[in-house]
A protein has these predicted regions:
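Membrane-embedded alpha-helical bundles of multi-pass transporters
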Residues: 1-6, 21-29, 35, 49-57, ...
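Actuator/coupling domain of P-type ATPases
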Residues: 10, 20-32, 37-124, 136, ...
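Bilayer-spanning, highly hydrophobic alpha-helical transmembrane segments
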Residues: 14-16, 223-267, 272-275, 548-580
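P-type ATPase nucleotide-binding
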Residues: 25, 144, 319, 323-440, ...
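Residue-level signature of catalytic and energy-coupling elements of molecular machines
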Residues: 52, 79, 100, 119, ...
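Juxtamembrane helix-loop transition segments at the membrane interface in multi-pass membrane proteins
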Residues: 53-56, 99-109, 273-292, 591-597
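Conserved catalytic phosphorylation-site environment of P-type ATPases
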Residues: 68, 167, 267-340, 480, ...
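Conserved ATP-binding TGD loop and adjacent catalytic N/P-domain core of P-type ATPases
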Residues: 380, 408-549, 587
Length: 597
């Protein structure tokens, strides 16, 4: 709506300006042309004054006061064509700035689409589908294989395996036994289960994520734009020069002539054009930056926080270690495990099959026990692969990470462990961010502390926060001290959506990530390449350097013109034309932000 309003103002000025030109130079009715421009100028000045009051009430400063004064002053001394030029510049700059500040259309649509809509309520032997908001605490609910847990609850039957990636971001399967709790939004495994509803839908974990995002969106961080920081001193300088010129000359026209050349073109045009140019350059590099303000913040970020799975890592469990405890070779141990698991749909089974370099052996009499493992007959031997207690009754040295244990003919043979593979570019990305002035790199993960610390050490991250749910991630960001702000958060999943919205700058890895994360973020990396994050920081810093230089060049030129105009040698209409020259210079300089260094 804001963008539409500014475009309407711009076209309103163009249309009425064209009519005024026709009245004066074609119909030779200068009086009507002046009246039309005067009414237009007073009307828009009033609208700008209302906007300025709203801006001041929000705690921000702008350049509207100077612009309003310039319009009113030129109209008061009958320099209405100069006023029209100023109006064109102002409304055109506002429309351009709003174009640069594009926003996401549907911030939470993916979260809402994926949230459970119905539940299977069980009453005795009868199963009935009910709307999710009709579930009450204590209801007995059926959850079929592959379905999303509708509410937070306690397992009445089991065991089962659940995927909590949408909540914690971690891809590893979680085994759940009877009596354990499950969270809404987690995906059930391959066995139908019954659960008792412990919470209503509105109070369950998945809906809590939606609320967290909404809350973060409604409480944006305060931020002072570069143009606003220059606005106050520039406005005061213009009024001082204009007042002195009027005071010494006694001619109010002199006041208008100074303010016309002081119209804040560099602040209104140069910065937005530099930002649009920087956004265009970012887009060419596979990074969608949604607003110009995002680039300003990104250039100032002191802390980068990263989710682990899917961001620093690839989000896929791969075979990490093969540890035999008998004379069996590593290749044979992996072959046995993969052969036994080859018909299973379990995520670890798929990883085993993908990792095996040997031909898979035929498996007969395959029997899979949910959340425990697989038993099969291979080459006349009973092979078991799965949890340690499933494959052997004897105590074994367990891996400190996700693992599949293997036994043959009742003899424990060893285990195959898994890890989430690091992105090959992760370490270089962290080094680049350090080089670009980011001294605090943080990892916030839902994974266990030892694994999170190991990953952080390998890539060069400074702080680690592990075993975090979405609300915990928000708390970590909120508790960062002032000297480590602004903060940028980088993530890829639905579970990252609240923290992306909470951070000063949210960056979503959108190549394979959830739409909810992308829409809650301020910037989206379209390519599956973490180095784009450091590239975004580099582009933001370069863009703001060019924007700052363009603004300062414009201010210096305007100041020189104000001093000259104070002696009465620049008529208002000529001053307005000079302003367009200043516009051209600052715009051409600002466009440098489109190019690489």
């Amino acid at each position: 709506m804001q963008q539409l309003r500014e475009y309407k103002r711009f076209w309103f000025v163009i249309v009425l300006g064209a009519i005024a030109l026709w009245l004066q130079f074609v119909n030779h009715q200068a009086g009507w042309a002046q009246i039309l421009v005067t009414v237009l100028g007073v009307f828009l000045a009033l609208l700008m004054f209302i906007d300025m009051v709203k801006t001041l009430r929000s705690g921000k400063f702008g350049v509207d006061l100077l612009a309003i004064t310039a319009v009113i002053a030129t109209l008061a001394v009958s320099e209405y064509w100069a006023a029209l030029i100023v109006l064109l510049m102002l409304t055109g700059g506002d429309a351009l700035e709003d174009f640069a500040a594009r926003r996401a259309n549907s911030e939470l649509q993916e979260l809402l689409n994926n949230s459970p809509q119905t539940a299977h309520r069980a009453v005795g032997d009868d199963i009935a589908d009910v709307a999710i908001n009709e579930v009450v605490v204590g209801d007995r609910l059926l959850v079929r294989p592959g379905e999303v847990m509708p509410v937070d609850g306690t397992l009445l039957t089991g065991p089962t395996t659940v995927n909590e990636a949408s909540l914690t971001g971690e891809a590893r399967p979680i085994d759940k036994q009877v009596g354990e709790t499950v969270m809404s939004g987690s995906v059930n495994g391959e066995a139908s289960i019954y659960l008792r509803a412990d919470q209503t839908a509105d109070n369950s974990q998945y809906q809590n994520i939606v609320r967290l995002v909404k809350q973060a969106e409604s409480q944006p961080a305060k931020f002072v734009r570069m143009a606003d920081r220059y606005a106050v001193p520039f406005t005061l300088l213009a009024y001082v020069i204009a007042g002195i010129a009027w005071g010494f000359s006694g001619d109010p026209v002199r006041f208008a002539e100074v303010l016309v050349v002081a119209s804040p073109c560099p602040l209104i045009l140069a910065a937005p054009i530099a930002l649009i140019s920087g956004m265009s350059r970012a887009s060419r590099n596979g990074i969608i930056v949604k607003t110009g303000t995002t680039l300003e913040k990104l250039a100032q970020v002191k802390t980068f926080a990263f989710d682990k799975t899917g961001t620093i890592t690839q989000g896929k469990l791969v075979v990490d270690q093969i540890v035999p405890v008998t004379a069996i070779s590593q290749a044979d141990l992996l072959q046995l495990a993969a052969s036994a698991e080859q018909h299973s749909g379990h995520v670890l089974a798929q990883s085993l099959v993908a990792a095996s370099t040997e031909k898979l052996l035929p498996a007969a009499d395959v029997n899979e026990t949910t959340a425990q493992g697989v038993q099969a007959n291979i080459d006349g031997q009973t092979i078991r692969a799965g949890k340690a207690e499933f494959v052997t009754d004897k105590p074994v040295d367990k891996a400190d990470k996700t693992a599949v244990y293997v036994s043959a003919a009742g003899i424990y043979q060893g285990y195959v462990s898994f890890s989430d593979k690091l992105r090959p570019e992760a370490k270089d990305t962290m080094a680049d961010l350090h080089r670009l002035g980011v001294h605090n790199l943080v990892m916030i993960s839902g994974d266990r502390q030892p694994i999170a610390k190991q990953i952080a050490a390998e890539v060069g991250i400074d702080q680690v926060h592990a075993e975090c749910l979405p609300a915990d991630k928000i708390n970590v960001l909120a508790e960062l001290p002032a000297d480590q702000r602004p903060v940028a958060m980088v993530g890829d999943g639905i579970n990252d959506a609240p923290s992306l919205a909470t951070a000063d700058v949210g960056i979503a890895m959108g190549a394979h990530g959830a739409t909810a994360a992308s829409e809650s973020a301020d910037a989206v990396v379209l390519k599956d390449d973490l180095t784009r994050v450091s590239a975004a920081r580099d582009i933001a810093q370069w863009t703001m350097r060019i924007a700052r230089q363009a603004v300062l060049i414009g201010i210096v030129i305007c100041t020189v013109l104000m001093v000259i105009a104070s002696f009465g040698v620049i008529p208002a209409i000529i001053g307005a034309v000079f302003q367009e020259v200043v516009d051209t210079v600052t715009i051409l300089y600002a466009l440098r932000a489109r190019t690489d260094r």
